[in-house]
Swiss-Prot record:
It comes from the Bacteria. This is Phosphoribosylformylglycinamidine cyclo-ligase. It is found in: Cytoplasm. InterPro entries: PurM-like_C_dom, PurM-like_C_sf, PurM-like_N, PurM-like_N_sf, PurM_cligase. Its EC number is 6.3.3.1. The keyword DNA repair does not apply. GO terms for molecular function: ATP binding; phosphoribosylamine-glycine ligase activity; phosphoribosylformylglycinamidine cyclo-ligase activity. Its main location: cytoplasm. It is an enzyme of class 6 (ligase). GO terms for biological process: 'de novo' IMP biosynthetic process; adenine biosynthetic process. It comes from Burkholderia multivorans (strain ATCC 17616 / 249). One of its GO terms (cellular component) is cytosol. Belongs to the AIR synthase family.
Length: 351
């Protein structure tokens, strides 16, 4: 069978002609290696660039249980594209996964990321990965690998998507699953740094309606910077707290807000009653509620409303927990208590 004939003057095609620049990918790897190197920790075997990433579970664990979590940044990325601001979304990516595995008592060990785009901009991608590495440093886990996918025609120019996953370990006997939570326990709320990475489809709709000047001053910084503030990472202060106090349950306040995330750690028959006057609603959430005409119930169901992590401890341990977390740099409030559920009542109510 004869091969098909090409046009007389046609030149051979390359991958670059198809929109994939292998050299740009190699340049990115060279740029991000120093960022990843700063995240190295005990357990990492080998460096970036292998087919698989190797990690040895620390010997301090007698019966280690691996805990994994995966997530993205959601439509917060659309705002990042609009603002051409790419230095914070990497921390968002890490925070969403490490905070999730933390709630079961896990120490984050390593993280891998996936960066997908239509055309690779090396500087933009490097800025994003630098943020990922900074998030890994804040959570004490190693950035041990990742994937950069340049896929022509899949994404609009200047846009990309992010995904990542974290793996951690917890001693089998110390898994936190909420099973010891009882009536009378106290719910502590740790302050969020802002909107974090959930609810941005509604945020963008409010911005579209209000049409604000995003560069205008908003309580000492631009409104854009307030909206894009990276998700707070709670790993180090909470791991330290677990060494001193019996933490009974934790809830990372993500999509679904306080009212849908706290029930995930409560046994049937228990309700967390939260006092919305126990902590201040940050100005950014007031702005969103006012300009979007968003009802209180919807705010609590969509946004973190100033609380990024809920921690449940016994009443006897509550003051010590607040003191320790405050000393570690966290803002903490006693935001509620656990009680028996009333018939037909939700497992988290805000009063």
């Amino acid at each position: 069978m004869n091969p098909p004939k090409s046009a007389p003057d046609a030149q051979g095609l390359s991958y670059r002609d198809a929109g994939v620049d292998i050299d740009a990918g190699d340049a990115l790897v060279d740029k991000i290696k120093p960022f990843a190197k700063k995240t190295l920790r005990d357990g990492v075997l080998g460096g970036i660039g292998g087919f698989g990433a190797l990690f040895e579970v620390p010997k301090k664990y007698k019966e280690p249980v691996l805990v994994s979590g995966t997530d993205g940044v959601g439509t917060k990325l659309k705002l990042a594209f609009h603002l051409n601001k790419h230095d914070t979304v990497g921390q968002d990516l890490v925070a969403m996964s490490v905070n999730d595995i933390l709630v079961q008592g896990a120490e984050p060990l390593f993280f891998l990321d996936y960066f997908a785009c239509g055309k690779l901009d090396v500087d933009t991608a490097a800025t994003v990965v630098k943020g990922i590495a900074q998030g890994c440093e804040l959570s004490g886990c190693a950035l041990i690998g990742g994937e950069t996918a340049e896929m022509p025609g899949m994404y609009p120019d200047g846009e990309y998507d992010l995904a990542g996953f974290a793996v951690g370990a917890v001693e089998k006997s110390k898994i936190i699953d909420g099973s010891t939570i009882a009536e009378g326990d106290v719910v502590l709320g740790l302050a969020s740094s802002g909107i974090h990475s959930n609810g941005f489809s509604l945020v963008r709709k409010i911005i579209e309606r209000a049409n604000p000047d995003l560069s205008a001053d908003f309580h000492g910084r631009s409104l854009a910077d307030a909206l894009m503030a990276p998700t707070r990472i709670y790993v180090k202060p909470l791991l330290a707290l677990m060494q001193k106090i019996a933490v009974k349950g934790m809830a990372h306040i993500t999509g679904g807000g306080l009212v849908e995330n706290i029930p995930r750690v409560l046994r049937e028959g228990l309700t967390a009653e939260l006092d919305q006057k126990a902590w201040p609603l940050p100005p950014l959430f007031k702005w969103l509620q006012e300009h979007g005409g968003v009802a209180d119930a919807e705010m609590h169901r969509v946004f973190n409303c100033g609380i990024g992590m809920a921690v449940i401890v016994s009443a006897a341990d509550a003051d010590a927990a607040v003191s320790d977390l405050t000393a570690a740099g966290e803002q903490v409030w006693k935001i509620g208590t656990v009680r028996a559920s009333r018939e037909g009542e939700a497992q988290t109510v805000v009063v």
